[in-house]
Amino acid sequence: VRTWLERSGAVGKEIARSVSLKQKGMMRTAPDGKWMPVTADQRIITGSPAFIWIAEVAAAPGIFLSARDTYREGKGRMYIRALSLFPVADAGGPEINQGALTRYLAELVWVPSAAVNDYVRWEDAGPGAAKATMTWGGITASGVFTFDANGDMTGFRAHRYYDRKGGATLEEWIIRIEPGGYREFGGVRIPARFSVTWHLKNGDFTWYKMELSDIRYNE
C-alpha cells in the first residue's frame, strides 16, 4: 500500500477534501445486452464520506436515461429516469447502503491521499494484495486491492448486492484496471481506465467500461 501511495504522489500531501471527475464509457444492463454510451460527472467528499454520480446513457437513438447514484450520511440511493422525466427506478435500503459504501471504498483509488483516513483500516491479504475495511453509518464494507510488482494497483474485488428477480444476492464485484491505464491529474498519478464485472454462478458479467477524462481536486 505504501508503495502505491508513493507512486501516486500522495505521500506528504494533505488529504484532498473533494474530487470532481468526468467519465466516459459504455454500459449494458444484461450479459447479452447491447453496449450503450455513457457520460458521467461525479463528486467525492472525503471528510464525511459522500459522493454523487450523475450519468446520461444513450439507450437508443433519441432515447436517453438519466441516472443518479448518491451516498450521503451513510445512505445510498439510485435514481433512473427516462428522457430525464419519467421514473424508471428509485432504490434505497440496506442493500443499496452497503453497495454505495463498497463503491466509495473502491473509488479511493482516485483519491490516494484519503486512503489513510481514520475510517479506512488496512491489513495484509497475501502477496500483492491488501484488504481495506471501512465502517461508516453503522455499515461495514471491505474489499481486496491487488498490486503488481511495481506497486501499481491492478484491481479491486468485494462482495456487493446484485439486484435480480426475486431479490438482491451478495455476489463478487470486480474492478479491473486496464493495462497502461494510468494517467496523472494535478500531480496525482491514478488509474484512469477500468472495467467493472459481476462474477456470477453462470459466468462473468462485465457491465461497465470506463475512462476518466478529467479529475480536479479541492475545487
Task: Name these PLM-found stretches.
Residues 56-63, 81-87, 159-162, 196-201:
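Short, solvent-exposed aromatic-acidic interface loops
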Residues 27-38, 53-62, 105-117, 132-138, ...:
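Short, solvent-exposed secondary-structure boundary motifs
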Residues 3-84:
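N-terminal mature ectodomain segment of secretory-pathway/periplasmic proteins
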Residues 78-138, 169:
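Flexible, processing/modification-adjacent segments and terminal tails
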